[in-house]
Amino acid sequence: MILFENVKGFTYAFDKNKKDGAEPYSHKVIRGLKKLGYNVKDQVIDFSQFGVPQRRKRFILVGIRKEIGSPENFEKLLMENRDPFLAQKGLKSNVTLLEAISDLLRSNGEIPSPDRKGFYSGKYGHTKLTNYEKLMRGDYPKTHTIADSHSFAKQSTDKIECYKRLLADYPQRGKRIDGDAREQWGIKQRGITILDPDTVSPTITGSPDDYLHYCEPRIMTVRECARIQSFPDWYEIKKKYTTGGKMRKLEVPRYTQIGNAIPPLFAEQAGIVLKKMLQS
């Protein structure tokens, strides 16, 4: 049995020479697996429909050896399993950004980061928690004052002031600010999106500068990104926080590790369904 995941763009035909007849890589993979003796079913799935607080559409392919069975019912079984699975965890199918990270505000207080010299990490908030936050926290806060990898980036005064203006006056949330608007608002980077707390997050990427926190003038922490990806707080993330230049080819920093991952909350549901398919 095979479970294969990739970005939605994997299903598009890209041809550097712009010739007719370009074939999506997804088709090549499917054809190759069939030649190897697999029954194959592919689909594009939005993980936000499965309790993950993030709009993340991914190409999912399931392959089962022909002598064992067919993966045809994978998506149907996934949907049938979803509601009872989420109910058991106290969750609904659509979790908003606010419901996922409202307890990780910088205003809760901060202490020196234990794994990042010269930086500060945020303390846990003690406000009423959502069911999603309770699930992600587990018992971790009983033995830890701060969440793992919840270290705040250092930002210039100019950038902080720019972020404050955006939070106060920019009319749209959840839409990327680039082009003329970027220059008009004094944004130095290539673009940024102000997150909307009342809906699911856009797709988490490996770039920390893509998103502005919904109510604080700062970018997201690794832990906040991990929460949105449904990694529980006990899951420790290692290595550097960021990297750059030529080292991008050699290192996989924390933001990238999280941005490239399959959300565990979806992976668990997929695993349950795959197990049922093998046993049937």
Question: Each PLM stretch: what is its role?
Answer:
Residues 1-182:
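Class I S-adenosyl-L-methionine
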Residues 122-280:
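C-terminal target-recognition/interaction regions appended to catalytic cores
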